[in-house]
A protein has these predicted regions:
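N-terminal, positively charged/glycine-rich alpha-helical extensions of SAM-dependent methyltransferases
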Residues: 1-31
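Class I SAM-dependent methyltransferase Rossmann-like catalytic core
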Residues: 23-46, 54
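Class I SAM-dependent methyltransferase SAM/SAH-binding core
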Residues: 65, 71-74, 78-122
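A conserved beta-strand element that flanks and buttresses the S-adenosyl-L-methionine
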Residues: 134
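A short, conserved alpha-helix within the catalytic core of class I
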Residues: 142-153
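Conserved beta-strand signature within the Rossmann-like core of class I S-adenosyl-L-methionine
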Residues: 159-167
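C-terminal alpha-helical "lid/dimerization" subdomain adjacent to the S-adenosyl-L-methionine
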Residues: 167-210
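Conserved Class I S-adenosyl-L-methionine
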Residues: 200, 204-230
Length: 234
């Protein structure tokens, strides 16, 4: 690995996290996330391997919670997979950033979607539960203490399984994104923040010690880490 990426750089701040960032650029970023996650998020494989069996087992009471849902694109993507499998699933996204919720509220959503300006610990205090709990690109934003707290919340909230997906830091991934992304994504924070996200992200051996007991870390191509908890309340 290049010395440049030999260690995480958790002190980097992403432009879209600035409360004073340009709103048009921010909204364009939310819109373009859908393309990014379709291309490299690997959520169809995650769904088939880790989510679908639990959702089928839950029958007509299946539900998915997305912690830190951003603009809601992951839930929209998963809804398509569930619909293809004739699964009735309730979708809930929580997001503490009011700007994301305002963006979401301007979009059209099916009746079985709910979005809340909330955090995971608030849902724990409300004693809520979901079949599967997920997050996407959340881990690298959190301090070790925050990560432990969100993992514990997710353990409580999930009846069947938790899957947290994030980038794995690598020179090849950084180089590929730096080369290709500027050709695809304009007038947004996707390129600049994507590169910063890679620099902030973990490698597999770095992430494992920061997760509570009962969690495991798996690699998934391209350049993904999945933190998975297979416990649950039922």
């Amino acid at each position: 690995m290049s010395l440049f990426l030999s260690e995480r750089d958790p002190g980097l701040r992403e432009y879209m996290d600035d409360p004073d960032c340009d709103l048009e650029m921010l909204h364009a970023t939310y819109r373009q996330f859908e393309t990014v996650n379709k291309l490299i998020g690997g959520w169809k494989r995650i769904y088939k391997t880790h989510m679908r069996p639990a959702l089928i087992e839950a029958g007509g009471n299946a539900s998915i919670l997305d912690i830190g849902c951003g603009g809601g694109d992951i839930l929209r993507l998963l809804n398509g997979f569930c619909r293809d499998d004739n699964l009735d699933v309730q979708f809930t996204g929580i997001e503490p950033d009011t700007r994301a919720i305002e963006f979401i509220n301007k979009q059209s959503w099916p009746d079985h979607f709910t979005f809340l300006n909330s955090s995971s610990d608030e849902l724990v205090h409300q004693n809520q539960s979901f079949t599967v709990v997920i997050s996407n690109h959340l881990i690298h934003h959190l301090s070790p203490l925050e990560l432990n707290g969100v993992c514990r919340d997710a353990e409580f909230l999930a009846n069947k399984r938790v899957i947290f997906s994030d980038i794995e830091r690598s020179f090849i991934g950084y180089f590929c994104f730096r080369t290709i992304a500027p050709l695809l994504f304009k007038n947004s924070f996707i390129v600049a923040d994507g590169l910063r996200s890679i620099r902030r992200s973990y490698q597999k051996n770095e992430l494992s010690p920061h997760l509570p007991d009962g969690w495991s870390v798996h690699r998934q191509l391209p350049f993904r880490l999945l933190a998975i908890y297979k416990g649950g309340k039922s």
